């Protein structure tokens, strides 16, 4: 995938989130999804390339990120299966109610107080809006939990990347009662990195 200034460089552990989604929606099983904070589009496009029965939305608040997503979408000839949407507030997204089978996201999750301590090659060159998750790294997750139940079909899945175990504990305390825990996934270092919920 092509990346450049203004977009997050995909991380290896994010591949595990894609693999998890494909376990629930394997090749040939049709579904409609949203990739929130799509960045370069790598998550959404990887899903579409692996499962030809999927269609999706790639959503981001950054016009620069969406330009890269559009470049990658065109490169992989997936314009007819991935729509791109600029949105900063999940509550205002132009998505029909209960229309999605799953939502997947690698959102900004680094606590604001830890931004200054990031490695220079990350802090100085990658877009802060793709990294800075506000207080405790939880700002966008809170918005997700308020809005996403309205977008997901009953039984729909929410698959999230996180900062790790301590943040997941905080998320479990914040998540809407409309969601049931399905799975937690370890990254390559044995840290709980991803969490999956199902809408009741």
What positions do the PLM features span?
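Dynamic helix-loop-helix/coil hinge segments at AAA+ ATPase domain boundaries and subdomain interfaces
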Residues: 1-8
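Conserved Class I SAM-dependent methyltransferase catalytic core
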Residues: 2, 135-197
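Conserved SAM/SAH cofactor-binding pocket of Class I
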Residues: 9, 16-117
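Helix N-cap/beta->alpha junction signal
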Residues: 11-12, 164
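Class I S-adenosylmethionine-dependent transferase superfamily signal
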Residues: 21, 47, 122, 144-148
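C-terminal beta-strand of the catalytic ATP-binding
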Residues: 109, 198-200
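Mobile active-site "lid"/loop adjacent to the S-adenosyl-L-methionine
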Residues: 109-140
């Amino acid at each position: 995938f092509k990346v450049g200034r203004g977009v997050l460089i995909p991380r290896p552990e994010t591949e595990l989130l894609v693999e998890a989604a494909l376990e629930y929606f394997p090749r040939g099983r049709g579904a409609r999804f949203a990739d929130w904070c799509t960045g370069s589009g790598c998550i959404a496009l990887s899903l579409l390339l692996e499962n030809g029965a999927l269609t999706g939305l790639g959503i981001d608040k950054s016009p620069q990120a969406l330009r890269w997503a559009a470049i990658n979408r065109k490169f992989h000839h997936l314009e007819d299966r991935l729509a791109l949407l600029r949105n900063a507030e999940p509550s205002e997204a132009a998505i029909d109610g209960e229309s999605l089978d799953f939502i997947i996201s690698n959102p900004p999750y680094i606590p604001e107080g830890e931004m200054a301590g990031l490695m220079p090659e990350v802090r100085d060159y990658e877009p802060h809006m793709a990294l800075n998750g506000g207080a405790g790294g939880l700002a966008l997750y809170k918005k997700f939990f308020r809005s996403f139940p309205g977008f997901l079909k009953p039984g729909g899945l929410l698959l999230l990347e996180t900062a790790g175990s301590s943040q997941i504990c905080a998320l479990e305390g914040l998540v809407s009662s409309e969601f049931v825990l399905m799975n937690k996934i370890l990254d390559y270092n044995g840290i709980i990195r991803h969490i999956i919920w199902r809408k009741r």
